Amino acid sequence: MHAKSLTELRAALDAKECSAVELAQHYLKRIDAARDLNAFVHVDAELTLAQAKAADAALAKGEAGPLAGLPIAHKDVFVTRGWRSTAGSKMLANYASPFDATVVARLSAAGMVTLGKTNMDEFAMGSSNENSAFGPVKNPWDTNAVPGGSSGGSSAAVAARLAPAATGTDTGGSIRQPASFAGVTGIKPTYGRVSRYGMIAFASSLDQGGPMARSAADCALLLNAMAGFDERDSTSLERADEDYTRHLGKTWAAGGDAGKPLAGLRIGLPAEYFGAGLADDVRAAIDAALKTYETLGATLVPVSLPKTELSIPVYYVIAPAEASSNLSRFDGVRYGHRAAEYRDLLDMYKKSRAEGFGPEVKRRILVGTYVLSHGYYDAYYLQAQKIRRIIAQDFQEAFKSCDVIMGPASPTVAWDIGAKGDDPVQMYLADIYTLSVSLAGLPGMSVPCGFGAGANAKRPVGLQIIGNYFDEARMLQVADAFQRATDWHVQEPAGV
C-alpha cells in the first residue's frame, strides 16, 4: 500500500479496496516501526483515526473532498489544533495552538488525514535537521547521513514511506534541498501563492509553504488544495485559483508529437551553477538528467545569473534581520518557555530566551540584531535589499531566452550527521543554488535524478527546476514528463 501514489491511493479508497481508517493504521504502524529515524516529533493515533473515520463517513455519503482519506504529515512549523506545534524548539516544546494554519485547514477541508507533526531544524534555521531540540533526523537512504533541512522530517517521512505526502516550508531552500537529499519531489511555489497564516515565522519576506511527495503529479494535487488567496495573510497574492494538474501528460506545444513531448521547451543552464564547488557525482547525475530532457525534445540554452555568488551574503543579512524581529515575541511572558528561576522581569527575559533557543537560532538573532542596529542598517541591510532586487532582475533577463532554468539543487549529496556542525559557514554554502530563487520570490522544485558515486552511492541527487512567477503548472509538467521517462522517483531505500 505504501508504494502507491496519492492518485492510486484515492482510487483504492474509491474502489473500497481499503478504508481511510485502514490506510491510516497502515501508516501509523510504519511510523512506529521507524522511530529510529526520528522523522516525527508528535504522533497521536487517536486524533488521526478520528479524522480517518470522518473521511470514511464522507466517502460513504459521496460528500468527500478531492483528497479525502489520504494521509499527510505536517512540518511542525504549521500550527495545528489538537497537536503540539513546536517549530523544533524547546521554546515551544509544549505549545498547543488554538487554531489551524491555513495550509493545514485547506488540506483538512480537502479530506486529508493528519498522521503527525514532523521534525525540523529549530524555527526552520538549518540545512541538515541537526538543529532540532528533539534530535537529528536520519536519512532513510543512508542512516549515517542527514536528510537535509529545515524540512528534514518531512523529506525523511516521505522517502521512508511513512507518509505518502508531507508539508514543508522553504525560506532559502528548505523544501528543495531536503527533497534532493532524500530522493523525493518537493516544490516551493511563488512567494505569496500559499498562505503563511499559522506558519511560525522565520523570515517573513522569504518563507513559503509547499508540498513534498513521491512525484510531481502528487505535488500538483496537493498544491491544488494548498494554494490560494488568504485575507488573513498580508503577503498573500490575490490571484485566481488554478488547476496545477492541467498540463500533466500533455505535450509542451499544443498538438505536439507525443514521442517528443517537450519539443519547444527551452531549458536555461546557468554557467554559475556548474562551476567550481559542484561535486563530480552530482554533476554526472545532472548531466544525465539533461540528456533525458533532450531526448524528450527540449533544447538546452546557456544563460547567466551573475549575482549567484552574492546570494549567500545577501540572504544571511536579510533572513537573520527578519528572524531577530520575528523571534522577539518569544520572551517567556505570553507563551513559550519560561525560566523556572529569575530575579526580575529582565532576568526572566534573558534566562527564558537563553534556555529556550538553540545555538543556531541565537547566532542568527545576534547577526540580525547587528545588521539592523544604528550605524549598520544602511551598510548591510539596505545594501542587501538593493542586491536582492538585482538578483531578481538577473532571473528576468535569463527568462527572456528560456522557459525554465535547471541545475543542481545542492552542490553535494547529503553529508554525514555531525560533519559540518562545527563550521556553520560550510553549511550555509550548501544552499548556494537555492538561495537566489528564494530571494527573487520565484517558484523552484527538486526532483530525484540519480545517486552519488563511491561511498555516496546510496545518497540521492536532486535536479532543481526554476520557473518564472506563477509558472508552477508548467514546471510540474516539465518534472512530470521527466518522471514518466525515468524511475528515480519510485525507487525506495533498502528495507522500505
From Swiss-Prot:
Chemical reaction(s) catalysed: L-glutamyl-tRNA(Gln) + L-glutamine + ATP + H2O = L-glutaminyl-tRNA(Gln) + L-glutamate + ADP + phosphate + H(+)
GO molecular function: ATP binding; glutaminyl-tRNA synthase (glutamine-hydrolyzing) activity
Active-site feature positions: 75, 150, 174
Coiled-coil features, chain-numbered ranges: none
Keywords: ATP-binding, Ligase, Nucleotide-binding, Protein biosynthesis
GO CC list: glutamyl-tRNA(Gln) amidotransferase complex
Ligase among keywords: yes
Annotated EC: 6.3.5.7
NCBIfam families: gatA (TIGR00132)
PANTHER family in the cross-refs: GLUTAMYL-TRNA(GLN) AMIDOTRANSFERASE SUBUNIT A, TRANSAMIDASE
Complex and partners: Heterotrimer of A, B and C subunits.
Family to which this protein belongs: Belongs to the amidase family. GatA subfamily.
HAMAP family: GatA
Main function: Allows the formation of correctly charged Gln-tRNA(Gln) through the transamidation of misacylated Glu-tRNA(Gln) in organisms which lack glutaminyl-tRNA synthetase. The reaction takes place in the presence of glutamine and ATP through an activated gamma-phospho-Glu-tRNA(Gln).
Protein name: Glutamyl-tRNA(Gln) amidotransferase subunit A
UniProt organism field: Burkholderia thailandensis (strain ATCC 700388 / DSM 13276 / CCUG 48851 / CIP 106301 / E264)
